[in-house]
């Protein structure tokens, strides 16, 4: 890695670049070591310049809210990019179209839609991530996904080229899409429908009640660990885990939630190795018991 080149570049832009940056507080598991470079672009020109200069040279990982990421305790030999506050702007256009930056929290978009009397975004109140992360994995809950309200995506590639992708050109599947892995999402436009604010608010409250009843809250967890294996069985992944794994199993401080067994929890000071061992133990146990191979929903940064 050309650290000296990046240090020199950091003096040429207004955005902040940190070196040997601790990532532990940047994810919901509260697990992880350092990254050699941590770039938080405050504006698009700085991001374009960085990618044109280093996009092909460096290993790059985009970090959103960290609500779906497990980070290694070893130092990441690359660049972690976390888009700054100017990428979290949100605005409304005619015909009930909303544009949101990819660093915008899902809940912020849901609240904005509610305040403007636009329905269709209620489910986002229950997803604890950013717009960019939601687009990346076609996040969803309660039978609704990002693709259902998406109009278009603005993205940038590792060469610093910015372009717009209509939703109609993207093949979305369960928790995935066919877009190139190295794309960085900048913003997206979404379309909802006019709806009574009280109706929207009631639906949001109802969805939150369902979520809080079924899922752990205010704990160090990254949500669903594995995807539902929809191409192998109709059974939900939590049911497969419950039937295949002793739920009191733990590795260090890495435990299975007693509220939802597809949620793994750092009870105190679990290491990456602890959590990764738990994930692999569950994966192997389910395969041995059922023959079904689980795929991780959480992202691993190492």
UniProtKB/Swiss-Prot annotation:
Top EC class of this enzyme: oxidoreductase
Question: Cofactor(s) for this protein?
Answer: FAD
Does the keyword field hold Oxidoreductase? yes
Matching entries from SUPFAM superfamilies are given as: FAD-binding/transporter-associated domain-like, Uridine diphospho-N-Acetylenolpyruvylglucosamine reductase, MurB, C-terminal domain
Subcellular location(s) per record: Cytoplasm
Please give the InterPro entries that the UniProt record associates with this protein.
FAD-bd_PCMH, FAD-bd_PCMH-like_sf, FAD-bd_PCMH_sub1, FAD-bd_PCMH_sub2, MurB, MurB_C, MurB_C_sf, Oxid_FAD_bind_N
- Its primary localisation, in coarse terms, equals cytoplasm
Specify the FAD-binding PCMH-type domain's residue ranges. Answer: 31-210
Enzyme Commission number(s) of this protein: 1.3.1.98
- Which pathway is this protein assigned to? Cell wall biogenesis; peptidoglycan biosynthesis
* Keywords associated with the record: Cell cycle, Cell division, Cell shape, Cell wall biogenesis/degradation, Cytoplasm, FAD, Flavoprotein, NADP, Oxidoreductase, Peptidoglycan synthesis
Q: Which GO terms describe its biological process?
A: cell division; cell wall organization; peptidoglycan biosynthetic process; regulation of cell shape
CC annotations in GO: cytosol
Catalysed reactions, semicolon-separated: UDP-N-acetyl-alpha-D-muramate + NADP(+) = UDP-N-acetyl-3-O-(1-carboxyvinyl)-alpha-D-glucosamine + NADPH + H(+)
Q: Which GO terms describe its molecular function?
A: FAD binding; UDP-N-acetylmuramate dehydrogenase activity
* Record-annotated active site: 175, 224, 297
HAMAP family assigned: MurB
Chain's role: Cell wall formation.
Family, according to the entry, reads as follows: Belongs to the MurB family.
How is this protein named in the record?
UDP-N-acetylenolpyruvoylglucosamine reductase
Q: Which organism is it from?
A: Pelagibacter ubique (strain HTCC1062)
């Amino acid at each position: 890695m050309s650290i000296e080149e990046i240090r020199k570049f950091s003096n040429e832009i207004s955005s902040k670049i940190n070196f040997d940056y601790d990532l532990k507080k940047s994810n919901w598991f509260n697990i992880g070591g350092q990254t050699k470079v941590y770039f938080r672009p405050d504006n698009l020109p700085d991001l374009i310049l960085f990618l044109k200069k280093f996009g092909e040279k460096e290993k790059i990982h985009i970090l959103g809210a960290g609500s779906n990421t497990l980070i290694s305790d070893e130092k990441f030999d690359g660049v972690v990019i976390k888009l700054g506050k100017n990428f979290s702007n949100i605005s409304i256009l005619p015909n009930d179209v909303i544009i949101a930056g990819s660093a915008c929290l899902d809940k912020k978009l849901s609240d904005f839609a509610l305040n403007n009397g636009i329905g269709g975004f209620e489910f986002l109140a229950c997803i604890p991530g950013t717009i960019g992360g939601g687009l990346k994995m076609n996040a969803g809950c309660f039978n609704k996904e990002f693709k259902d309200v998406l109009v278009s995506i603005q993205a940038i590639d590792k060469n610093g080229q910015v372009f717009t992708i209509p939703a109609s050109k993207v093949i979305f599947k369960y928790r995935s899409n066919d877009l190139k892995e190295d794309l960085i999402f900048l913003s997206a436009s979404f379309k909802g429908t006019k709806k009574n604010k009280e109706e929207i608010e009631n639906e949001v409250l109802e969805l939150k009640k369902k979520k809080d009843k079924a899922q752990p809250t205010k704990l160090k967890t990254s949500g669903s660990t594995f995807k539902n294996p929809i191409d192998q069985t109709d059974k939900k992944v939590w049911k497969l885990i419950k039937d295949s794994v002793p739920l009191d199993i733990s590795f260090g401080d890495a435990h299975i939630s007693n509220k939802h067994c597809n949620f793994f929890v750092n009870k105190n000071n679990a290491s990456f190795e602890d959590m990764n061992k738990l994930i692999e133990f569950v994966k192997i146990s389910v395969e041995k018991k059922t023959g079904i191979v689980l795929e991780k929903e959480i992202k691993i940064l190492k």
